[in-house]
Amino acid sequence: LADIYLYNPRENTKEKYFISELVVKYITLIKHPGLVTPSSVERCMQIAYNAKLNSGCLSRQVGAVITDENYSVKAVGWNSVAEGQVPCNLRTINNYLNNKDEDTFSTFEIENTQFSDHMYKTYDDVINKDVLNGRLCAYCFKDEYKEITGEKNQVHTRSLHAEENAFLQIVKYG
């Protein structure tokens, strides 16, 4: 996780020292934490950055914050599967190969023979030889699907976008 992010929003900066001022600000924060408070935007970005740690997605973790015009936080979201579904970081190869639980895996994953054959071919040796030494191995549906189809498309993710999740929080809780 990055702790420092410098951004120069000015394209035609006449103020020569804008970036220098930001560097001084962060050095001050390092040497004397709490002396300089973060800007409203920095505070919201830090919240979004921390929110992404809740993501159940293996391939991409994203956080989002919705604020009003005064930067008062109204909702926080992160990319994860829809309510009631099991996130990819909790779905394991062992469970897929040995169980194929309908509550955990999609109808496509359970019934599509091409997908099932790919999973057995790719992971059966790993499971049978106990290469993982008892550790669990999660898998990303999108990555496996892209490998089968040869597509580079990101469309086949199971996760809701972080922004979508934040908007759903507003709708659900006000």
Give residue spans per PLM region.
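Zinc-dependent deaminase catalytic domain
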Residues: 13-174
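Phosphate/Mg2+-binding loops and adjacent switch elements
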Residues: 1-3
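G-domain G4 guanine-recognition motif of GTPases
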Residues: 5-13
